[in-house]
C-alpha cells in the first residue's frame, strides 16, 4: 500500500524548500549610491550593476531592482524570476513596465573565469549554465510578450554604459529626464 497523499505533501514541501534554497544562493553585496523609485536602498551583485543604477538614476529613470517578474515562473528547478531592473514610465496616461537584464558576458557570450572558480565547476560548465539562464530569461519575455532591454559586460568595454542605456531607453519610449549634479547629490544615500 502506497500513501500517495503523504508522498505528494512531501514532494510539495521539497519543491518549496528547493525554491527557497535557489533564491538564497544569490549573494547581494554592493550598495548603490542612489535609492530606487520608492526611496529604498539597493544592494546589487556587481560593480557593473552598481554603475547601471547610477546611470538610470542620473537619466531620471524610475526603477526597482530585482522585483519579481509580473508572471509566475517558479517551478521545481527555478525560484521566481526577478529581472535585474524593472523600469516604470507613463505612456499615454498608462504606467508601463519594461525590464532590463545585465548579462555578465563578453562580446563572445563568455563569462569571466572566476564564474567557474567561485562555483567549483569547469569553465565550460559555467558558460553553459550562464548562457542557459540567458536563453531561459529571453524565452520568458518572448512567451509573455514583455519588453526586455539587455546590456552585457562587453558594453562596459566598448561603449559608455550611460550612452548605451540612453539609446536603449529612448528606443523603448522611456522618457529621459536627466538629473543635475545638485539633484543627484540630494539623492545620495548615507
Segments and roles (model prediction):
Residues 1-15, 19, 154-190:
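A basic/glycine-biased coupling hinge at the interface between accessory DNA-binding modules
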Residues 1-43:
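Interdomain/boundary linker segments immediately adjacent to catalytic/signaling cores
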Residues 41-53:
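Nuclease catalytic cores
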Residues 57-77:
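A short acidic/basic microdomain associated with nuclease active sites
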Residues 70-80, 153-160:
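Acidic-and-aromatic substrate-binding clefts and catalytic sites of carbohydrate-active enzymes
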Residues 82-134:
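Short beta-strand-loop-alpha-helix junction that forms the active-site gateway
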Residues 145-152:
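Conserved catalytic segments around the Walker B and adjacent sensor/switch elements
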